């Protein structure tokens, strides 16, 4: 989520609601039974995204502590759960892990889990949560760029999650998808999210800047804005079709692309006042997801793709 001081200007827009980031950084290691690795991206460039996410790491969980995100997370986990590996010894990865929300769920489910984030402060938050975790020895923490993760072995993971739109934040989404294909096992599954290009159109229309609208439609690129200009970074948005093509070019079989969420409940959180109401809304989301056209109205897209067996 963006700073409260965010102000969209010119051809830029403030995109929101994410759990993720990318890049190469130094880190401090510690904690017992937890392996740490530092992965260099090979690119020495100004990394605004890293600076932003390092700064907000300590308050990150609090930013997303409200009924909307409880609904969002319940919806997400129900989409992930059918793809959990049947083999208890399988390895999983959480790319752009942030403070570890999804990786910790995988770890709790019994899977050896690799947590990857470009922001060292985020990885430190994960480390703190793991210190009292009885499954900590099954966790590997990596500070690195999802575009280039040479220390992740080929054909390693049965399930790879990339939640919070790391594909939109990273410098090269195709390279990131190629990396995912490399380290996903045959018949393994990747579930990833990205910013929806169609949802961002309203911002440009609201600004009344036709030239900016034309540029955005042409490129699909916008920016994450904060009060501190040194923390502003570029975002790549996708349509359902372009996100599917991204994964198909890497060699994946696309199983689904859905919007998340389709129902704009964030505009009226009173709809989420009870667990019973949340359950009803989750069921409605599942029903709407059956229609591919529904994805167009969601702020974010979620793709599920499988790496096929090579015959």
Regions found by a protein language model. Give the residues of each.
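Class I SAM-dependent methyltransferase SAM/SAH-binding core
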Residues: 93, 99-148
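Conserved class I S-adenosyl-L-methionine
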Residues: 40-87, 101, 105, 189-220
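A C-terminal cap/extension of S-adenosyl-L-methionine-dependent methyltransferases
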Residues: 245, 255-311
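A short glycine-rich, Lys/Arg-flanked "PGG" loop and its adjoining helix->strand segment in the class I
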Residues: 174-189
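Acceptor-substrate binding/catalytic loop of class I
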Residues: 227-242
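A short SAM/SAH-binding and catalytic strip from SAM-dependent methyltransferases
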Residues: 158-172
